[in-house]
From Swiss-Prot:
Keywords: Aminoacyl-tRNA synthetase, ATP-binding, Cytoplasm, Ligase, Magnesium, Metal-binding, Nucleotide-binding, Protein biosynthesis. GO terms for biological process: phenylalanyl-tRNA aminoacylation. GO terms for molecular function: ATP binding; magnesium ion binding; phenylalanine-tRNA ligase activity; tRNA binding. It comes from the Bacteria. The keyword Cytoplasm applies. SUPFAM superfamilies: Class II aaRS and biotin synthetases, tRNA-binding arm. This is Phenylalanine--tRNA ligase alpha subunit. Binds 2 magnesium ions per tetramer. It comes from Rhodospirillum rubrum (strain ATCC 11170 / ATH 1.1.1 / DSM 467 / LMG 4362 / NCIMB 8255 / S1). Mg(2+) binds at residue 258. It is found in: Cytoplasm.
Amino acid sequence: MDNVEDLRGTLLSAVAEAGDLDALDAIRVSALGKKGQITGLMKTLGAMDPEARKAAGQALNLVKDEIAAALDARKADLAAAALEAKLARERLDVSLAPAPEATGAIHPISQTWEEVVAIFAQMGFEVAEGPEIEDDFHNFTALNFPPGHPARAMHDTFFLPTREDGSRHLLRTHTSPVQIRTMMGRKPPIRILAPGRTYRCDSDMTHTPMFHQFEGLVIDKATHFGHLKGCLHEFVRAYFEVDDLPMRFRPSFFPFTEPSAEVDIGCSRKGGALKIGAGDSWLEILGCGMVHPNVLTACGLDPEEYQGFAFGMGLERIAMLKYGIPDLRTFFESDLRWLRHYGFAALDLPTLHGGLSR
């Protein structure tokens, strides 16, 4: 037992020099394991006389406890050092600029919708809505479409299956049924804007089976074509943000208006680039006219007492013209790159005072 102190010193030095937890565990096994050095000395106590066994046992227990305490302390130090190294590797530099946040963008159709509503709201119009699945009366008959009109054909309109009573519904081909429902449901004066989705059997670079349209309707006792011209002058100049935008009305025909007109705005096509404003070219943007007496009668209004005007245009079309979007189909492709390029800030709401399309 004379070498207990030497063993103690050797083991304490080895514990202090252990560079990692694996080395420390190897020292624990060699000292305190079943075949460890201290364990081996403890097994020799049985061959000693009682007095010597008592003294040697006390000495070995002290060394055993001291080595165990040293192992625990060194293990705690190594664990703390490992944690410190890990934290140093994962340290964040709070002075660095943060990564840019991924933000959404307002779709050009939604932006154009809000711009149009903002302009007409300043003129006293209110937004009216109606169902997208309509019946023949509201979509055609009440709007003075004759029975053989091409719009009633299967190749131009999406019809739903025929019902048991022989009637069949359809996807509305315009938002004009909203006008019909409004005139039948309330008394004049009426001043509404009817934006929404419409459906027609058509698909190419400038047509899609579903598109957005907005229509306006004014009904009162003294409404005339001059009011229509003034209203549309205000709109096109505010929307395209061109104060002196040239504008002309060409005679046309629509079943639901009489007289009817198509509206052109001035533009320039020099160098192959379209520029809205002064120029030697004209660009058609909408249709309009005075509400046909037959339409007023179908809605229960006396055409001798009330007159009105209506107008309509495609949201995609005027968005393409204002924002230089070449292909109508890209509006519906859900391409995030396209939306980042043509989209608008979510909180930048259009107003006439603050600006429509900042």
